[in-house]
Amino acid sequence: MKGKVYLVGAGPGANDLISLRALNILGKCDTVVYDRLASEDFYKDLNCEKIDVGKKVGHHSVKQNEINEIIVQKALEGKTVVRLKGGDPFIFGRGGEEVIALQEHNIPYEVIPGITSAISVPELAGIPPTHRKISQDLHIVTGHTAEEENVNYKALAQEKGTLVFLMGVGNIEKIANRLMEFGKDENTP
């Protein structure tokens, strides 16, 4: 009998920003497969198998295809699996790739959304990502790509709305320079 996999977003890091549904599912799982960005407080006291796939920038202790294999194998063993991810599973969390792996094996799954840092960080700093008469649209862009040209800086530089770059701390100067190269005002906040 196949188990079920829950792709669970742990939110932006503060322990009180994870959803009640996520906490309920965590309390019932047989296996939790977690990333570095998910707080240890969410799983350290659980009475279940814990698998650290500790991904961080520039160092993947476990490759994505291996993570896919782990969650598939555990589900095929009949286990209830939580794939615990920082932020939201589908905002640069590679949750889409994990869903494809589950679908290929006809494994039931459910996504439990998490609060993405793309929204929460500006809000916690008192900055609304959208604001009537100032920014009517919001673009969430990766700040870390294998191939820089995957990001259309020319189009982004022309946008009047809010640009949020995730995972871009190491590339912030390059990102800003590319946007200004295509016409973004250097005084843009």
Where in the sequence are the language-model features?
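Class I S-adenosyl-L-methionine
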Residues: 1-10, 15-112, 120
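A contiguous loop/helix-start segment that scaffolds small-molecule binding in enzyme catalytic cores
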Residues: 2-7, 76-81, 137, 146-189
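Short, solvent-exposed amphipathic alpha-helical segments in soluble enzyme
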Residues: 21-25, 47-50, 98-101, 127, ...
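Short phosphate-engaging motifs
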Residues: 25, 117, 171
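Short secondary-structure transition/capping segments
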Residues: 45-47, 64-65, 122-126, 142-143, ...
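Short hydrophobic/aromatic-enriched beta-strand-loop microsegments
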Residues: 49-55, 106-110, 129-136, 183-189
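Class I SAM-dependent methyltransferase SAM-binding "motif I" and its flanking Rossmann-like core
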Residues: 88-90, 95-159
